Amino acid sequence: RLQRQYGNIDLLRTALEGQRFQAFVLDPLPGSHHWRQCVAWMVAAALLQGKPAVLVLPTMREIEDMAETLQSIGLRCFAPTQSSNGAYGGDFAILNAQMAPAERYRAYLAISGGQVRCVIGTRAAMYAPVDGNALFLILDDVCYQDADGMMPYANARGVLRLRAKAHNGVFVAMANARSVQSQWETDAAHVGATQVSGFSTPIHAFPAVTKEASPWIRWLNRDELARLADSTIGARVPHTAVRVLSKALESGPVLL
């Protein structure tokens, strides 16, 4: 399905199947669920190739949503099993500061020992002890939670890209709105390669798909109101807006 929606998505699939470093900037389609489906597809593709996956998400809300999506495709969260000896098992683990120290350390040991190959968490998960040419993904790389205010001021985006480059992995930056860094990296004409930056292949949905998935938007500026022959063009809330709001209230709530 993603192949029919995004350009350059085949390059990402090839990278996940390959053995060399590649970086991507992916612009997910609108919607609270679509980005999770994209990430789940990448995680599944990486795990099928025997590659670990590290997912750095902004807050616990995104982590819980992502865990739910991974479970919907058949992956199990690291948790106690039904065995009588109290063993733990699972396909992915969560690392965050809200966990009890014992639970967090147990998940850390499972990751470092290779028992769990997929990690999702907040900024600190960028240091997850995975080895090999893993998938390193960050969501909304411009959010303030990803910046460290202490020396050496490590940023999650730079750390993940550095790890991917050092281990011939795949780096993916996802956001509904590209960060300045991501936009810079998608222009091969001027971007320079450093340890934490360089060219990234842009992955964007086809125009027709984006138009179909996007909400209908109209800007009621003076030109548009004049075109509609609205006599209340100078009012704080023009008659056209009042009419649209009144009609919308007949079928549901309105956010103003």
State each model region's role.
Residues 2-36, 172, 176-256:
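Conserved interdomain linker/interface between the two RecA-like ATPase lobes of SF2 helicase motors
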Residues 35-49, 71:
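Walker A/P-loop NTP-binding motif
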Residues 61-87:
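Conserved helicase motor "Helicase C" RecA-like lobe of SF1/SF2 P-loop NTPases
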Residues 125-167, 171-172:
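SF2 helicase catalytic motif II
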Residues 69, 83-119:
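Conserved motor-coupling elements within RecA-like helicase/translocase cores
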Residues 59-63, 98-101, 125-127, 141-144, ...:
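Conserved nucleotide-binding/hydrolysis micro-motifs of P-loop NTPases
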Residues 93-101, 143-153, 227-233:
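Flexible beta-alpha connector loops of hexameric P-loop NTPases
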Residues 51-59, 93-95, 253-256:
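Conserved RecA-like ASCE P-loop NTPase motor core of nucleic-acid helicases/translocases
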